[in-house]
């Protein structure tokens, strides 16, 4: 079991119904989506179901990054970065 790191402000979403409600309110189809700090991937799972053009996942925590790699590496439209969100170059998506 992963314990949230309070130093990183981590809180894990556990209820898939809440994740689904969040994603249902957003137009994701054929959009480039950047998800910062996805934690264990509950919202990520719902984003992927909505078929984004590309999903960019940015996770600073090394353990969560490894978990996300295992879950999503084989999905063609998903890129996963182990980096602080402040250091990511967002200008490539303009």
Regions found by a protein language model. Give the residues of each.
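Catalytic cores of RNA-modifying enzymes
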Residues: 1-94
């Amino acid at each position: 079991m992963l314990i949230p790191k309070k130093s990183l402000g981590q809180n894990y979403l556990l209820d898939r119904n809440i994740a689904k409600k969040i994603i249902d309110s957003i137009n994701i189809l054929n959009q480039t989506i950047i998800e910062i700090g996805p934690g264990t991937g509950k919202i990520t799972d719902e984003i992927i179901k909505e078929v984004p053009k590309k999903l960019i996942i940015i996770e600073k925590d090394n353990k969560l990054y490894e978990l996300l790699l295992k879950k999503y590496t084989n999905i063609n439209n998903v890129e996963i970065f182990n980096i602080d969100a402040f250091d990511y170059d967002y200008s490539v998506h303009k």
